[in-house]
Amino acid sequence: MSIKKNLYIISFFIIFNFANAEENLKSVGKFKDWESFILSQDGNKTCFAQSIPVVRAPKKLKREPSRLFVSFRPAENIKNEVSVTNGYEFKLKAPVTAKSGKKSYDLFSKGKFAWVVDSKDDTKLIVTMKKASRLMIIGNTDKGDQTTDHYSMMGFTKAYNTAKKNCS
């Protein structure tokens, strides 16, 4: 099979799966700077609250969109999972940090995503997010550029509660 034909087949499956995922993705509420969703796939559902940053620095660095999530996946017994994508491949073994005021949480990265190091800290970070007006995510690209994304917490509690309720 030719390379061109292989690329065509791969592209078809990627597009089909993306379109299929969009059909199964439903917004269940917009709350100021946050939104809650339900994703249904293969009889399982994932509920999550998500937001995009209100400030991304440095401005001139080219990268894909950033997103901050709190997810619930009942089939996998996952609750309160905080994750983030900064729109780039994170630098291997470089720290990723979530900060609000004097509170700071360590995250580990794999590829384009990062998660809280200790799952017990997910709940602590969520409590911080409920009380905060802003959360900063500081990370490093695989090329060594440091980024800081600022997320508004306006609407977080309602979006979080909606996501949690829909997957309980």
Whereabouts are the PLM-identified features?
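A generic "folded-domain core" signal
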Residues: 21-168
